[in-house]
Structure formats: structure tokens, C-alpha cells
Design a protein with these regions (language model features):
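Extreme N-terminal segment that seeds HTH/winged-HTH DNA-binding domains in transcriptional regulators
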Residues: 1-53, 63, 86
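Beta-hairpin "wing" of winged helix-turn-helix
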Residues: 34-39, 67-76, 80-83
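Residues in the helix-turn-helix
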Residues: 57
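DNA-binding alpha-helical recognition surfaces that contact promoter or target DNA
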Residues: 60
């Protein structure tokens, strides 16, 4: 299932970088359980259009989420919510 993008927007007057605002918004969807493990995120161009940000901004936000283990990217398939890491 492809996850639906939240209705929140980037605050263009905030001193917080756009990529960080986007990362926080996407992470909140995962933490709140609105996006479940295995759900496919919308494409990078869709995220760009929805939030009115550059592809570089989207890639930086997604790259950080991937580094944190929140999402996984599969070349040619898309970006998916990752399975939670076990703490054992």
C-alpha cells in the first residue's frame, strides 16, 4: 500500500531547514502508526510537489530517515517504511 502524504506543510518562515521539517513530518507519520512497516512512500517527485520543495531537500530528508533505520530504499522499487529494529 502506498502511504498518503500528511496535510501539514513546510513553514517557510521558520529558521529550521526545510529538509529537517520534512524529515520530522515524515517520521511523525511512522511513529504515529499512520504508515506501517512495508508501506510504500510516495515517489520523490510526488513529495516534492506536495511540499513544494526541491528534490535535493527530499533526498536529504529521506537519506537521514534511512540512516536512522526508519525507512528502506530499494533501487527500482521505491522507498518503504522499515520494520522496527529489535532491541534484544
Amino acid at each position: 500500500m502506498t502511504a498518503q502524504l500528511p496535510t501539514s506543510r513546510i513553514d517557510r518562515t521558520s529558521p529550521v531547514p526545510f529538509y529537517f521539517q520534512l524529515k520530522k513530518t515524515l517520521a511523525e507519520e511512522i511513529v504515529a502508526g499512520r504508515w506501517l512497516p512495508g508501506d510504500r512512500l510516495p515517489s520523490e517527485p510526488s513529495i516534492c510537489d506536495h511540499f513544494e520543495v526541491s528534490r535535493t531537500t527530499v533526498r536529504q530528508a529521506l537519506g537521514e530517515l534511512e540512516a536512522e533505520g526508519a525507512i528502506r530504499r530499494e533501487k527500482g522499487r521505491g522507498t518503504f517504511v522499515a520494520e522496527p529494529r529489535s532491541t534484544s
